[in-house]
Structure formats: structure tokens, C-alpha cells
Curated annotation (Swiss-Prot):
<dbReference type="GO" id="GO:0005524">
    <property type="term" value="F:ATP binding"/>
</dbReference>
<dbReference type="InterPro" id="IPR003714">
    <property type="entry name" value="PhoH"/>
</dbReference>
<feature type="binding site">
    <location>
        <begin position="135"/>
        <end position="142"/>
    </location>
    <ligand>
        <name>ATP</name>
    </ligand>
</feature>
<protein>
    <recommendedName>
        <fullName>PhoH-like protein</fullName>
    </recommendedName>
</protein>
<dbReference type="GO" id="GO:0005829">
    <property type="term" value="C:cytosol"/>
</dbReference>
<dbReference type="Pfam" id="PF02562">
    <property type="entry name" value="PhoH"/>
</dbReference>
<keyword id="KW-0963">Cytoplasm</keyword>
<keyword id="KW-0067">ATP-binding</keyword>
<keyword id="KW-0547">Nucleotide-binding</keyword>
<comment type="similarity">
    <text>Belongs to the PhoH family.</text>
</comment>
<dbReference type="InterPro" id="IPR027417">
    <property type="entry name" value="P-loop_NTPase"/>
</dbReference>
<dbReference type="InterPro" id="IPR051451">
    <property type="entry name" value="PhoH2-like"/>
</dbReference>
């Protein structure tokens, strides 16, 4: 079969590094999925292969041009999404995805939806007062909600930001734990703090909390309140009981938005206890003003090394013989 060659000039050494990835992982991935050979020499990428293979590589790289042209690292999910767009004829939508900027982190990093489903999730939050997002860890459920919440707070679109999750590991019996309230709930709410730190200087957060602009508390502390002009994020909702989730949903006041996130495959509730998130899917699926979004493994955004570690463990689990049963 005849071979063809195409070259892609890169604007800077940093662009070449961003495109190639750590250890040229991105080039290896492109080669594996197209059959083409990719050779990076300085600020020029050479692609060799069949006409179809070369065309696929060039189309994917052109769709990701906003990344490597600005020397922003390209991740495995970025490549997966670009291939999916190419194979499904959604290249224009994918290019629009790259141009949509949600926010910038404190370090100046651009935050945008990585996948089509993430973009649908963002649109749902913007359009609805209550949005459920269900999917596995690492899909950006809480992070994207926090991005929109912080932007709303900084742009004075809401009066306060409320982050809550069930402290199921402590059975919500926080009175049995040593320390004051803040010391008791911090370990359970740390993932929410991590999202805040991406956008707000850590030293400013205590002042915002003191002024009531940011509240981070376990779910039990929402009882009996009406949350008006607030942006509320309910995290780890798979660990709520139906009664708990109903309680927090009915706290919603005028001018507020609520995002409920969780992974229904990873509940810490006792086996006999139904998850409030699962029940809500059935009860609220047709309620006007409520949206349900579903993310899956294709939306997982991981550090490339973490991805390789996960894949290595999966290969080991698939090939290892079952452990022997203990003798009776």
C-alpha cells in the first residue's frame, strides 16, 4: 500500500512538548490508533502512513490546535474526544468545545469542558434550577459545578456559595468526634475545599466563610433552612438516604441553583438502605426545572501517568488467577 507524508510546523519548542505529551505518549497514542508513524524533529512533526491514516492524524491535530498552539498540554481524554468527533462527524462541535472558556484558575490555566457530555452538563446547570449529575469519579462532576459556582459568586450572580455532602463515614454523628465543628467536618469536605482552592486564594477563603459568602458543611446542617440567592452543590449524593436528599432539595429558595452530584455505583450506605440519588432518578425525572446529566468513563480526566497505572492494574487483574479459597 502506498505511503504518503505530511508535515506540521509547530510555533515553538513548548508547542512541540505540549503536542507530543510526556515521553511522547500522545504520538504513541496517535500512531496506535491510526497506524501512522509520527516523527518529531525540533519544531516539525512528520506523519508517515497511508493516505487515510495520515489524514486522520492531521485532522485530529488540527482540531486540537488551540491547545498546542498556546503550548497547553494535550491529555488522553482530549485525544479520545477528538477521535470521537472525527468518527461521528462532530468536528465543528468539537472545535466549538475548544473555544468555550469557562474560567481561569489562579495559575492562569484555562478551564473548559473536555467532552461533549461535560458541555451538556454545563448547559444544564446554566438553564435549570436543579441539576443532577451522575457518573464515576474523575469525570469532573464536582469540579465543573464548583467552577460555575465560584464564577457566579465572583460575578455577584449569587449571594453565597454552599457546599455540602453527607458525612456518611461518621454516620453524621459528628457529636461523637473530637474538636469544634470545623475540625469535625473538614476531613469529609476536603474535596470541596480542593475545588475552591483552584480559583480563590486560600488565605481569602476564611474571610469569605466568616462573612457567610462561602459555607462548607455536612448535609445534616441544611435541615430547617431556606437557601435563597445561593449556589448550592450537594456532593457524594449517592450516600444520602431518600429522606436526606428530599430534605436538602426542599431547602431551595428563590434565586438559587442546586447541583447534586454522585456515583450510584459507589455507595457507602448499608446494603439494606436505598440511595437517595437512585430514588430521585425515578421520582424527579419528569419534573420541570430539574435536569439529569450522565457522565461515563469516556469523560474521566486523569493525569497520563495515573491513566497508565490504572491500565496496568486492570491488565494484572484480568490476567491474574483467582485467589485460592481458604480451607475450611
Amino acid at each position: 500500500m502506498s505511503q504518503t507524508t505530511a508535515t506540521l510546523p509547530l510555533p515553538s519548542p513548548e508547542s512541540a512538548i505540549a503536542l507530543a505529551g510526556s515521553g511522547e505518549d500522545n504520538l504513541t497514542y496517535l500512531a496506535h490508533h491510526t497506524g501512522a508513524k509520527l516523527i518529531l524533529r525540533g519544531q516539525e512533526l512528520m506523519v508517515v502512513g497511508t493516505e487515510k491514516a495520515v489524514a486522520r492524524v492531521m485532522a485530529v491535530l488540527q482540531s486540537l490546535a488551540p491547545y498546542w498552539q498556546s503550548a497547553k498540554a494535550i491529555s488522553r481524554p482530549d485525544l479520545m474526544t477528538a477521535f470521537h468527533a472525527l468518527d461521528t462527524g462532530k468536528q465543528e462541535e468539537h472545535q466549538a468545545l475548544q473555544k468555550t472558556v469557562l474560567a481561569k484558575t489562579r495559575r492562569g490555566e484555562i478551564v473548559r469542558a473536555k467532552t461533549f457530555r461535560q458541555r451538556q452538563y454545563i448547559k444544564a446547570i446554566q438553564k435549570h434550577d436543579v441539576t443532577f449529575c451522575i457518573g464515576p469519579a474523575g469525570t469532573g462532576k464536582t469540579f465543573l459545578a464548583a467552577v460555575l459556582a465560584v464564577q457566579a459568586l465572583l460575578n455577584n450572580e449569587c449571594d453565597r456559595l454552599i457546599l455540602t455532602r453527607p458525612a456518611v463515614e461518621a454516620g453524621e454523628k459528628l457529636g461523637f468526634l473530637p474538636g469544634d465543628l470545623q475540625q469535625k467536618v473538614d476531613p469529609f469536605l476536603r474535596p470541596l475545599y480542593d475545588a475552591l482552592y483552584e480559583f480563590i486564594e486560600p488565605e481569602k477563603i476564611p474571610d469569605l466563610m466568616e462573612r457567610g459568602k462561602i459555607e462548607v458543611a455536612p448535609l445534616a446542617y441544611m435541615r430547617g433552612r431556606t437557601l435563597t440567592n445561593a449556589f448550592v452543590i450537594v456532593d457524594e449524593a449517592q450516600n444520602t438516604t431518600p429522606a436526606q436528599l428530599k430534605m436538602v432539595l426542599t431547602r431551595l429558595g428563590f434565586g438559587s441553583k442546586m447541583i447534586v452530584t454522585g456515583d450510584i455505583t459507589q455507595t457507602d450506605l448499608p446494603n439494606y438502605q436505598k440511595s437517595g440519588l437512585q430514588v430521585a432518578q425515578t421520582i424527579l425525572k419528569d419534573v420541570e426545572g430539574v435536569a439529569f446529566c450522565y457522565l461515563n468513563q469516556a469523560d474521566v480526566v486523569r493525569h497520563p501517568l495515573v491513566q497508565r497505572i490504572v491500565e496496568a492494574y486492570e491488565r494484572s487483574e484480568n490476567t491474574s488467577p483467582p485467589a485460592p479459597k481458604p480451607s475450611s
